[in-house]
């Protein structure tokens, strides 16, 4: 039902924007439309309507907010300005010490400022998508202006959907990678079966609701500054990342009943996928040396790839590149090794910011091929905060990266 509702919401949003754009155009020009009598559509009514009225009007809407493929979309915060770096501050806990009256009284005058821990996240990124509409297509291949307009709208919506799918894959990979490499060993619990996993998930949910310093990664922030930071998570803020098969199992357990009694829809608090892999991370730097690799990358939208380009360590690809010659042995799939995987975390630990206002840029007309190219600029920032609770339950061996490696 939710998916059907989303589709209806998307259609309604686009329809309202298209209607508003048409009203504005008719007010400025006339209600009598033609394709024009030139060999191309440049400066004709159709070209003017699509590029000067329709697309800018849709660009003003929150079409990107309608979940066209991104299950993490509800977490995104729209901000007019996203700094390249974002820093989070917390005040460290102070442990009370009993007063020793035999000590020098001057000790009472010594100042003790609260300690502050910080975590500096990585930089955000600008995603670029482009699509090209051929004027001859709209002139010769469509019977009516309505058909041509629907075609233009369809291409635009598809590109936004592509961005959302890319964002979802990156967010999922980031969560999986964090759970396997960043958690403290004490926050990784072993399970031997579905039943055992469900029992440990229930216990973990109870643990996260206690005021404790055990379940965060503060000791890894600020270059390993020593300190204690207690955190507590409300039931409404706890989510689980897992597989579809485990979600279907968890929905039939006492965990779901616990959420239901609290008036919370448990299905909204389990983010699941049929496969938690599909994203690849570069483990060793190399150069692109084969035209087949260039053609493959360009087919997936990386049109700027060239022979001789260096692929750095840590680069992420949201599609399978492991079979390409240069990539073989130099990439690893970000994926749990076992199907028994449940990552329980406080939803506030996910930092997801973006800026989509005005993302559709003015078009560029190429008179040689009589085509118009549109660019979409999408600003995105994603990070995981160490200052909130997290517990991983799996049956695989997890070895968190050493402190020194994390600080490099």
Curated annotation (Swiss-Prot):
A GO cellular-component term linked to this record: viral capsid
Domain of life: Viruses
Keywords, ordered alphabetically: Capsid protein, Virion
Subcellular location field: Virion
Function: Assembles to form an icosahedral capsid.
The protein, known as: Major capsid protein
Source organism of the structure: Staphylococcus phage 44AHJD
Lineage per the UniProt record: Viruses, Duplodnaviria, Heunggongvirae, Uroviricota, Caudoviricetes
